[in-house]
From Swiss-Prot:
Annotated SUPFAM superfamilies: Prokaryotic type KH domain (KH-domain type II), Ribosomal protein S3 C-terminal domain
Family matches, as InterPro entries: KH_dom (IPR004087), KH_dom-like_a/b (IPR015946), KH_dom_type_2 (IPR004044), KH_sf_prok-type (IPR009019), Ribosomal_S3_C_sf (IPR036419), Ribosomal_uS3_bac-typ (IPR005704), Ribosomal_uS3_C (IPR001351), Ribosomal_uS3_CS (IPR018280)
Protein family according to the UniProt entry: Belongs to the universal ribosomal protein uS3 family.
CDD domains attached to this UniProt entry: KH-II_30S_S3
Segments passing through the bilayer: none
Keyword rRNA-binding: yes
NCBIfam families cross-referenced by the UniProt entry: rpsC_bact
Residues annotated as domain KH type-2: 39-107
Lineage of the organism: Bacteria, Pseudomonadati, Pseudomonadota, Gammaproteobacteria, Vibrionales
Protein name: Small ribosomal subunit protein uS3
Leader sequence segment: none
Originating organism: Aliivibrio fischeri (strain ATCC 700601 / ES114) (Vibrio fischeri)
């Protein structure tokens, strides 16, 4: 039976960047990894209402640099930068090194997989009909230029006794094409009937020229063999 690989993991280094870019010795690696996990946990908890897309962590020379991708940068920064300064102090305390926080704005939240999944989950928690929430997300993404989108929800939909999965797709979502830029994200809605899982795949187009042309080695053509002339 065929199984689905994680769409982001299989594309790392091809069309997808890493969410953490640092190198460490074997002695420091576990501490850094644990620090990353705690920093992400802290920021996700503090920025619940800030439409958080992703968190990128870098560790240049005895410090930590965190880039927060959000659709609402004003909520993260706060009045006169008070909130971002509080976040910086919190991250520095967790990591144990000086911290720097950068804010990157997500221009089109309707085309960001994580934001779409979180939006559907919050609507389900507000008792919006799941089909309406799914259809609205699909229509908004296609209207803003997505090549394709698939949304799946699973659980006790509509308070049903038996859990089931339902999905809605429009356009193309080529999971086997490695050069396809597919934004995959998951979220969960905590309703009175239980937890409903949300999965979103957004196909934004193919990334051509991923490998530089200079690195591509062309096979050498065989030289035509010269015919020997017979001596008279």
């Amino acid at each position: 039976m065929g199984q689905k690989v994680h769409p982001n993991g299989i594309r790392l280094g091809i069309v997808k960047p890493w969410n953490a870019t640092w190198f460490a010795s074997s002695q420091e690696f576990a501490d850094n990894l644990d620090g990353d996990f705690k920093v992400r946990q802290y920021l996700t908890k503090e920025l619940k209402k800030a439409s958080l897309s992703r968190i990128v962590i870098e560790r240049p020379a005895k410090s930590i640099r965190v880039t927060i991708h959000t659709a609402r940068p004003g909520v993260v920064i706060g009045k006169k930068g008070e909130d971002v300064e509080k976040l910086r102090a919190g991250v520095a305390k967790i990591a144990g090194v000086p911290a720097q926080i950068n804010i990157a704005e997500v221009r089109k939240p309707e085309l960001d997989g994580q934001l779409v999944a979180d939006s559907i989950a919050s609507q389900l928690e507000r008792r919006v009909m799941f089909r309406r929430a799914m259809k609205r997300a699909v229509q908004n993404a296609m209207r803003l230029g997505a090549k394709g989108i698939k949304v799946e929800v699973s659980g006790r939909l509509g308070g049903a006794e038996i859990a089931r999965s339902e999905w809605y797709r429009e356009g193309r979502v080529p999971l086997h094409t490695l050069r396809a830029d597919i934004d995959y994200a998951t979220s969960s809605a905590h309703t009175q009937y239980g937890v409903i899982g949300v999965k979103v795949w957004i196909f934004k187009g193919e990334v051509l020229g991923g490998m530089p042309a200079a690195n591509a080695v062309e096979p050498k053509a065989d030289k035509p063999k010269k015919q020997r002339r017979s001596r008279k």
